[in-house]
């Protein structure tokens, strides 16, 4: 990596904060216009050479623009026009971001699809979106799926390699390129994780997706030594959000194409990040077994976005790395002047957000000095206009009462593509319902207990799965590497909670149910009716973004308690 900085001067970053035309559709152009270090590499891809050594390749802002323009010429030559949705089914890494840039520069709407999605689900999703074309790393299975129903086939179904090999000199870009977006223009479609069924298609708008991120221009660590490893799926709003931030900052960033520890740790050792951004899936692996001491030696901050991570994993990660003197407080927290001295260990910034929220709208920071506070996601960020806990009728409930988490903020999605009815179902009393169950304490801190679809309906009342998982992961850590708690039918009526666990290497499940229930009783939580060990990957199913598919666990174990129960007289 170059010794010359790629980071935009503070004055440039401050101007971004007040630019009324800046948004998700033109942030690359704004960055290349304003950053005097536009020729210095900042975005890094990675690969292994023939000796198994990590090779990092840097791309400057100018490099990204050149690649974008070449890809845009291919799309334009293939008939893509403003407002048309195009499917992008490309493996994680920098490549899907280049296609995002190319399509938005034409005013088209990239429908970014995680290539791990099942192909039958993918075809249903792309057909619902109404894409005019699809670019994919491998079109074989998609083509086969479309042959079963030719009416669904889009105008083109092309290989990524075809776009990469295109001779851009043979095609012209359209007049008025790059496209000038209006604030409300849709610039991307992001699918949900599919944990509840067919993925929803969340719209990201030009200005909406930038709202709330302005404070990052001055409150995201961007010292000369700072480097970010981005493990977010870059076909997801989280990955796009972080890359928008680092592009505008000019912050050196390695865009990972693989989230597994076996791939991540060697790149950490080569890149030496000071920050790591990920969904919980990678944090679980990094916190398991021997810690990645060498790769995380310089890490001062871990950023999690999505469903909040678990304390049992967080407490191990924050023992790694070091915090430099004056480390700024993240944008998710109330603004305060940083005065702390250099400290050992790191901070874990746990943000509760979603594609629909546009970013993490709640934030909690855990460091080695922080006391345990299970399921706390902190207070709303400054972009949030209102945050509340509502009952089913949309009435705000008192502090300490569990209800539906609701937010009002300019970062909230315009809605779901081609599904106004679904969009309206998430709007209530001027709020957006996040799909989460939570409560607020008297100090204004929010506690995230479950997704609404995962609440366990017992005869004694609702049981929330996430607090139970916290206990298993933190207090049964010698045996439990990861777990998921779901509700299944009980012969006496209602549901009871069961746990599906992945054991630590070499650990046994002997006595685990009894030990877990003893710890749950100490915490005042419901006990588990049963426990099952997931020995194989298919027994602990994950969605395209790495989230556990609880619906599949509920189906798999639906008869567990009925089969185990004695026959009724």
What are the functions of these language-model segments?
Residues 210-227, 235-291:
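Conserved AMP-binding/adenylation subdomain of ANL enzymes
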Residues 309, 314-443, 452-455, 468:
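Conserved AMP-binding/adenylate-forming
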Residues 521-548, 564-569:
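AMP-binding/adenylate-forming catalytic domain of the ANL superfamily
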Residues 44-53, 57, 140-184, 193, ...:
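ANL superfamily adenylate-forming
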Residues 409, 415, 437-527, 552:
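AMP-binding/adenylate-forming catalytic core of the ANL superfamily
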Residues 57-62, 187-211:
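Conserved AMP-binding A3 loop
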Residues 77-78, 105-168, 180, 297, ...:
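Structural core segment of the AMP-binding/adenylate-forming
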